[in-house]
């Protein structure tokens, strides 16, 4: 499964981890982004503290499906796969909390954090926020739009592969040694 993974990004309504209001994914196969998808999600709250960031309000999502409704569409991209996210602790925390809210189990998957990849690959940057790294790499980004953020995450990882970094050193320790994302150092 060389250079194949799914990048994800969540937007949340507020500080509650289970308040996902948008999910975006970018699917990478053989080093190419082959598809992008985005879902608006009706969270279990009407409190939208972060509308100023992403522009999503309760009115935007009140008639949208819940995460429990869209999970069957998303699950195949996650289960047993490599999942990438920028600042993965946040997005995986949202995924875990949201699945728990709907009493669904968290499937097994492997994690790569494009934030860690960026820090290792481009240590000279002033910071490694998604917007900073994307600007450095001339990646088009509509920040805080989940599909755009997921695509930027995927592109950061692919650029890092082109920069001759040994990605296995930044992939979650649970990744088996035989599952080498980029075939070692180029």
Q: What is the role of each PLM region?
A:
Residues 1, 156-186:
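Acidic two-metal-ion nuclease catalytic site recognized across multiple nuclease folds
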Residues 1-109, 123-124, 130-144:
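Conserved non-catalytic scaffold segment of RNase H-like nuclease domains
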Residues 94, 116, 152-154:
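Hydrophobic side chains within alpha-helical segments
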Residues 110-113, 172:
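Beta-strand segments within the central parallel beta-sheet cores of soluble alpha/beta enzyme folds
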Residues 112-123:
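Short, flexible loop segments at boundaries between secondary-structure elements
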Residues 145-148, 167-169:
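Short, charged, surface-exposed loops that flank catalytic or proteolytic processing sites
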Residues 146-159:
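Acidic, divalent-metal-coordinating active-site segment for phosphoryl/phosphodiester hydrolysis
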């Amino acid at each position: 499964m060389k250079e194949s993974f799914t990048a994800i990004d969540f937007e949340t309504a507020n500080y509650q981890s289970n308040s996902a209001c948008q999910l975006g994914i970018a699917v990478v196969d053989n080093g190419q982004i082959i598809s992008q998808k985005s879902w608006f999600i009706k969270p279990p709250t009407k409190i939208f503290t972060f509308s100023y960031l992403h522009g999503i309000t309760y009115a935007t999502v009140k008639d949208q499906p819940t995460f429990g409704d869209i999970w069957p569409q998303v699950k195949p991209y996650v289960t047993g796969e490599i999942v990438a996210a920028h600042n993965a602790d946040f997005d995986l925390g949202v995924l875990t909390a949201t699945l728990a809210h709907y009493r669904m189990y968290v499937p097994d998957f492997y994690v790569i954090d494009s934030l860690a990849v960026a820090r290792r690959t481009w240590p000279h940057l002033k910071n490694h926020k998604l917007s900073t790294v994307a600007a450095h790499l001339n990646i088009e980004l509509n920040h805080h739009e989940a599909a755009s953020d997921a695509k930027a995450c995927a592109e950061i990882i692919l650029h890092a592969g082109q920069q001759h970094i040994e990605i296995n050193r930044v992939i979650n320790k649970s990744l088996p040694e035989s599952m080498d994302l980029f075939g070692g150092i180029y």
